[in-house]
Amino acid sequence: MMQPSIKPADEHSAGDIIARIGSLTRMLRDSLRELGLDQAIAEAAEAIPDARDRLYYVVQMTAQAAERALNSVEASQPHQDQMEKSAKALTQRWDDWFADPIDLADARELVTDTRQFLADVPAHTSFTNAQLLEIMMAQDFQDLTGQVIKRMMDVIQEIERQLLMVLLENIPEQESRPKRENQSLLNGPQVDTSKAGVVASQDQVDDLLDSLGF
């Protein structure tokens, strides 16, 4: 015996499923819009690549500053080494002369070499000072990167605040797990969840998430 066709019923069921999916999708979309989450999601999607670019900028600026400082140190080192070597040599020669005075010709040569050393010192110190200035100027990246990092911290804190507000406003009461009694005294003052913007520290954030079961 042939089975009766159930095609109309199948078509009716499929239509109901599609209708329900569409209704649920619309409800979810409306709920997101009412909660402001649609904009929050869009902002988060934009914030992630922006944060990545900002971090890359900080890395670049830090690397450039480090390279400039290292180059200046390497350039200054030979000048410092040369002055140190010449000064030690002249000091030893003068010590020897005072211990056993030499003839006039040798003394004149010692004086001439000493005067030449003194004449060369300003050039070495001037070059070194220029390199020190370059090292100091290389540290200006801290102002720029500091502003970038501060901006990123502000964005992260705002996202955290918004997410906490969503949890506080929408998590079902029965899903909140009671805090363990042995931790209640260790966590200090509890967060007043009836007021907006009261979460002021990371410890309070952790306590709040723990009390909500996360």
Curated annotation (Swiss-Prot):
Residues 174-199 are annotated as: Disordered. The record marks Q147 as: Enhances dephosphorylation of CheY-P. Changing F117S: Loss of localization to the cell pole. Gene3D superfamilies: Helix hairpin bin, Single helix bin. One of its GO terms (molecular function) is phosphoprotein binding. It is found in: Cytoplasm. Homodimer. Interacts with CheA isoform CheA(short). Interacts (via C-terminus) with phosphorylated CheY (CheY-P). This is Protein phosphatase CheZ.
